[in-house]
């Protein structure tokens, strides 16, 4: 390669096929990680908005019966917190239909149903995080592999030369280092996004766990004071 022609494109085109394959893999992974980042960004924004909307409705004084009916009617558009609430109410009503009247049994059943629903919701919210973590941790090493291979390939080409100068070494080393640069380009955004998403998801989880405890307290109060239970009263 001409030492004066060391643009990124020329370095990629002049690299060995193994290094080019590594670069292609890293670029593909980078594109996939950016797609995952934007999907997760919009998904988390929607989750937060739906949870806030339901929580406002929940604390507005609307009866639990009406909230449950609304959640059942709009199940596909409901947010995680609303589905958690609906699962607790559904289990409570099933136990009541079986003529179970013990407050402890009713409360425990509703709480277990909400915890199970909470875990399902968190599995959905946390999806693709492992992919971003893998991209962030593995990409630099894949890029390093491409660099090492490229340097070995460059040194092999120097073996037949009588005199090796910086001008002859630089292009081969530069094209090998491009693989490391692409690996870092793929890894850094993935790591930053992973850390931000993990923090936001922890907040969502804490918020939903707090709601479960608050709703459980409401059920407990109503079970202790209302003959008809929470379906017969507000909160």
Residue spans for each PLM region:
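Predominantly long cytosolic amphipathic alpha-helical stalk/bundle segments
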Residues: 49-142, 149-165, 192-235
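Hydrophobic alpha-helical transmembrane segments and adjacent short intramembrane/lumenal linkers
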Residues: 162-176
């Amino acid at each position: 390669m001409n030492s004066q022609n060391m643009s990124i494109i020329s370095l990629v085109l002049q690299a060995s096929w193994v290094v080019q394959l590594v670069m292609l893999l890293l670029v593909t992974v980078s594109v996939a990680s950016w797609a995952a980042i934007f999907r997760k960004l919009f998904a988390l924004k929607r989750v937060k908005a739906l949870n806030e909307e339901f929580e406002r409705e929940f604390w507005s004084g609307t009866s639990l019966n009406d909230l449950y009916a609304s959640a059942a009617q709009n199940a596909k558009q409901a947010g995680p917190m609303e589905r958690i609430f609906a699962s607790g109410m559904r289990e409570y009503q099933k136990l009541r239909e079986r003529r179970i009247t013990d407050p402890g049994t009713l409360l425990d059943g509703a709480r277990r149903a909400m915890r199970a629903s909470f875990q399902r919701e968190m599995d959905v919210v946390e999806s693709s995080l492992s992919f971003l973590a893998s991209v962030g941790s593995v990409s630099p090493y894949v890029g390093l592999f491409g660099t090492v291979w490229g340097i070995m390939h460059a040194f092999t080409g120097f073996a037949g030369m009588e005199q090796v100068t910086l001008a002859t070494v630089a292009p081969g080393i530069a094209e090998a280092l491009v693989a490391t640069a692409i690996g870092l380009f793929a890894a850094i955004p993935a790591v930053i996004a992973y850390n931000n998403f993990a923090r936001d998801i922890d907040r969502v989880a804490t918020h939903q766990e707090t709601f479960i405890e608050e709703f459980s307290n409401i059920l407990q109060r109503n079970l202790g004071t209302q003959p008809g239970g929470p379906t017969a009263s507000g909160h």
